[in-house]
C-alpha cells in the first residue's frame, strides 16, 4: 500500500510543490516580514513571463497558418495574462517604502533589469535593441539574439494578413528580421482598408492592439509603483530606476 501511494501521481508530485515552496529564501536578518511577499511576487512574474513566451510562440504559429479563431483565442489569453500581471502590482503596493527599505540593501546588485525572460518577451514582440541583454550571461544573450533573427509577433501578423488576401509589400515581408520594424505607408493603407471591409481580420488586429495596450498599462503601473516606493533614487543593481522606466512608456509594440 505504501509503495503504491509513493509511486502514484499526486497534486504535490505533479506540480513539484515541495520544490516550489523551497525557492523562497529571504536574505534579510529576521528575516524582514515583507521580503517574502517581494520574492513571491517576482517569482510569480517569472512564471507568467514563461507562460507568455509559450503563448506568443503558439500564437505566431496560428497566425502564420492563417487560423483566425485559434489566433483570437491565444491573443485573448495573452491579454488576460497581462491583466493579471498588472493586478499583481496592487498586491506589491501594499508594501510601504519603509517596509521595502528594511530589506532593500540585501538585494545588492540584483535587479529586475536582469530578467532574461522579460527580455525574451520583448524580443518576441519585436524589440531589437540587443544591448539591453548585454548584462545577462553569454548563453542567455545568445538565446535572445536567436529570437531577434526570427519573426516577431507583428511579422507573424503580417503573414496572417497575406493569408487573408491582403497584399503586403515585399520589402516588409522579406526585410532583415534582426532589425526593428519601421512604419510602412502601404501596410498602414492595407490596415485602414481591412478595418472597413474585413471585420473578421480587423478583430485579430484589435487583439494585437489590446496586447500593446496591456503591456503599456503594465509598464505604467510598474513606473508608478517604483516611483512611489523609491522616488528618484537609483534602482537596485545600479539602474536609473524611474528615469529609465519612464522612457519605455512611449515605446508602443506595434
Residue ranges and their predicted role:
Residues 1-254:
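Surface-exposed peri-terminal alpha-helical interaction modules
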Amino acid at each position: 500500500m505504501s509503495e503504491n501511494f509513493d509511486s502514484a501521481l499526486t497534486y504535490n508530485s505533479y506540480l513539484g510543490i515541495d520544490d516550489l515552496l523551497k525557492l523562497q529564501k529571504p536574505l534579510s536578518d529576521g528575516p524582514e516580514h515583507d521580503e517574502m511577499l517581494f520574492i513571491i511576487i517576482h517569482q510569480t512574474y517569472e512564471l507568467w513571463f514563461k507562460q507568455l513566451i509559450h503563448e506568443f510562440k503558439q500564437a505566431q504559429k496560428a497566425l502564420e497558418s492563417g487560423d483566425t479563431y485559434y489566433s483570437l483565442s491565444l491573443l485573448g489569453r495573452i491579454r488576460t495574462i497581462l491583466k493579471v500581471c498588472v493586478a499583481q502590482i496592487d498586491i506589491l503596493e501594499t508594501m510601504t517604502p519603509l517596509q521595502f527599505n528594511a530589506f532593500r540593501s540585501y538585494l545588492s546588485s540584483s535587479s529586475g533589469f536582469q530578467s532574461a525572460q522579460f527580455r525574451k518577451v520583448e524580443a518576441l514582440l519585436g524589440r531589437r535593441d540587443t544591448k539591453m541583454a548585454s548584462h545577462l550571461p553569454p548563453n542567455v544573450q545568445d538565446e535572445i539574439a536567436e529570437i531577434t533573427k526570427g519573426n516577431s509577433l507583428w511579422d507573424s501578423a503580417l503573414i496572417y494578413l497575406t493569408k487573408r488576401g491582403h497584399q503586403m509589400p515585399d520589402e516588409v515581408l522579406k526585410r532583415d528580421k534582426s532589425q526593428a520594424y519601421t512604419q510602412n505607408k502601404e501596410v498602414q493603407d492595407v490596415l485602414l482598408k481591412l478595418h472597413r471591409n474585413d471585420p473578421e481580420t480587423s478583430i485579430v488586429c484589435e487583439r494585437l492592439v489590446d496586447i500593446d495596450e496591456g503591456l503599456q498599462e503594465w509598464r505604467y503601473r510598474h513606473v508608478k509603483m517604483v516611483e512611489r516606493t523609491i522616488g528618484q533614487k537609483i534602482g537596485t543593481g545600479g539602474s536609473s530606476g524611474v528615469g529609465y522606466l519612464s522612457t519605455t512608456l512611449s515605446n508602443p509594440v506595434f
